[in-house]
Amino acid sequence: MRRTFFKSKIHRATVTHADLDYEGSVSIDEDLLDASGILEYEAVHVWNITRGTRLQTYAIKGERGSGVICINGAAAHLNKPGDLVILATFAELDEAEARGFKPTVVLVDRKNKIVESDAVEIAGPARRVSA
């Protein structure tokens, strides 16, 4: 049996652009894609911390080193520049794969520069705040 597991996330990224007229997707700085292991065209969940909205789209490469997080298409109605978001992916794993699997968590600052790229999830009331 295969199960769905959390694979990777970019935590508390800042939306830099929202382009209503683009076809869709989320443009993500290529440095962040590399650090998180998110591939171009991979399904990505966008959880907006600022507005409480959630949606699913797909990733496309943004300019390397730019810090870009651009929400494209109709999703631009739900995400605006300056909003904080979590970008997350999931993977289907069988039990043997899942036993040793650890997700990738990338922490970024307010300019979407990598602060930590092998972060450990903090459970419960402990709180992590980006610089």
Curated annotation (Swiss-Prot):
Its cofactor is pyruvate. Binds 1 pyruvoyl group covalently per subunit. It is found in: Cytoplasm. The modification Pyruvic acid (Ser) is found at S25. It catalyses: L-aspartate + H(+) = beta-alanine + CO2. Pathway: Cofactor biosynthesis; (R)-pantothenate biosynthesis; beta-alanine from L-aspartate: step 1/1. Gene3D superfamilies: 2.40.40.20. Belongs to the PanD family. Heterooctamer of four alpha and four beta subunits. This is Aspartate 1-decarboxylase. The gene is panD.
